[in-house]
UniProtKB/Swiss-Prot annotation:
Origin species: Cupriavidus taiwanensis (strain DSM 17343 / BCRC 17206 / CCUG 44338 / CIP 107171 / LMG 19424 / R1)
Location within or outside the cell: Cytoplasm
GO MF term set: triose-phosphate isomerase activity
Active-site residues from the entry: H94, E166
Keywords carried by this UniProt record: Cytoplasm, Gluconeogenesis, Glycolysis, Isomerase
Listed name of the protein: Triosephosphate isomerase
Protein role: Involved in the gluconeogenesis. Catalyzes stereospecifically the conversion of dihydroxyacetone phosphate (DHAP) to D-glyceraldehyde-3-phosphate (G3P).
Quaternary organization: Homodimer.
Pathway(s) the chain acts in: Carbohydrate biosynthesis; gluconeogenesis; Carbohydrate degradation; glycolysis; D-glyceraldehyde 3-phosphate from glycerone phosphate: step 1/1
Length: 247
């Protein structure tokens, strides 16, 4: 049975004082959480996460990583640097990166590969827009996004990846895919991975990332192929994040 995983994506939120209070609250309840908990913080706060969470039951990670190992890439952050700050996870291909920064499927795959090279688990995000869903293109879109990763990674590397399905139309909009809609896409994604390796597919955590809240988490997480959540707004309140972790 796959262990539930709940990752908080703070996006571009936080301050040293607010983070300290948030992490203290999360740690206080992490010991009894049913899911494994992690937070993905903005780069400047990774040292704070390392200092406050080291030795706790809460893991931490980053929200992006460079596909390059090192060099003259101003503004980029290397996977080796994330490793020095104890990052377990890194998000790659989040819809906001794809939309606002023009990240291609191939760039996302390259970032995932680089993270794995330095022992960091890439959380590969895929998802469709409202227009794509209404046009019946959901499987074609997420399948294409996933295929780039499947082609770039070996089976062994794929076994160290976490997937996250984030319907773009349900992020920050208050809209949520029904549990059945989400399950259908998760099952499709697992099937695509299974076509490469059934064992990896059976073990892979596939998270749901579309406006998960304390009042809908339990129903979503009860679905066969939903193994937890990638949490946005609700991860900024310790009580909400813990409630989701206990769903």
């Amino acid at each position: 049975m796959r262990q539930k995983l709940v990752i908080g994506n703070w996006k571009m939120h936080g301050s040293l004082a607010a983070n300290a209070a948030l992490l203290e609250g999360i740690q206080a309840g992490a010991g009894v959480a049913r899911a494994t908990l992690a937070v993905c913080a903005p780069f400047p706060y990774l040292a704070q996460c390392q200092a406050l969470l080291n030795g706790s039951k809460v893991a931490w990670g980053a929200q992006d990583v460079s596909a390059e190992a090192r060099g003259a890439f101003t503004g980029e952050v290397a996977a080796s640097m994330l490793g020095e700050f104890g990052c377990t996870y890194v998000l790659v291909g989040h819809s906001e990166r794809r939309t606002y920064h023009g990240e291609t499927d191939q760039a996302v795959a390259a970032k995932a590969l680089r993270a794995l090279e330095f022992g960091i688990v890439p959380v590969v995000c895929v998802g469709e827009t409202l227009a794509q869903r209404e046009a019946g293109e959901t499987e074609a879109v997420v399948g294409r996004q996933l295929q780039a990763v499947l082609e770039a990674l070996t089976v062994e590397q794929l076994g160290r990846v976490v997937l996250a399905y984030e319907p773009v139309w349900a992020i920050g909009t208050g809209k949520t895919a029904t549990s059945e809609q989400a399950q259908a896409v998760h099952a499709f994604l697992r099937g695509q991975v299974a076509a490469r390796d059934a064992g990896v597919a059976g073990r892979m955590a596939i998270l749901y990332g579309g406006s998960v809240k304390p009042d809908n988490a339990a129903e979503l997480f009860s679905m066969t192929d939903i193994d937890g959540g990638l949490i946005g707004g609700a991860s900024l309140k310790s009580e909400d994040f813990l409630a989701i972790g206990n769903a």
